[in-house]
């Protein structure tokens, strides 16, 4: 009986040890996978809007067949790339804010709006893993720069304010007198179904 109990304790100990390793490395592996996936998406998106030596834009039809059937097929609904140098952030923007969209990138809450003209709301998950998705969004401060690259142009926005609202206060997405970028994520991080939203608003400063 004692032998069986000892074996059971050892088995339980092994299980707990394995679980410990799983939780220790899971977040790191998840971040590595997401980073690799984003690199592929960004590379594919930029190939659509890049310029050849002759100065003409490279069209999707000119990209290799293997790319069109692989990476480029993942770009359905892609609107551009959001870069935030201050927090080492770079992800692809997709139409909509469904769970599927937010699982692979940043969601454009109202796809009918135009970047550089309207107040464009971009939603992202607040991951608990450092540096993943909008995890570090709360670090942004006044005058920090956000960049959105589309196939048509590159837009630079300057952060003008950060604040917290209730998740029902959708007025933050209303158009203003000037083009805005409004980043939206849950807060605080790590809380299940939080009622508050962290908002970062930035004004357009350049378009090229």
Give the residues covered by each predicted segment.
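Solvent-exposed, non-transmembrane regions of membrane-associated and secreted proteins
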Residues: 10-208
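N-terminal Lys/Arg-rich, disordered targeting/topogenic segments
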Residues: 1-6
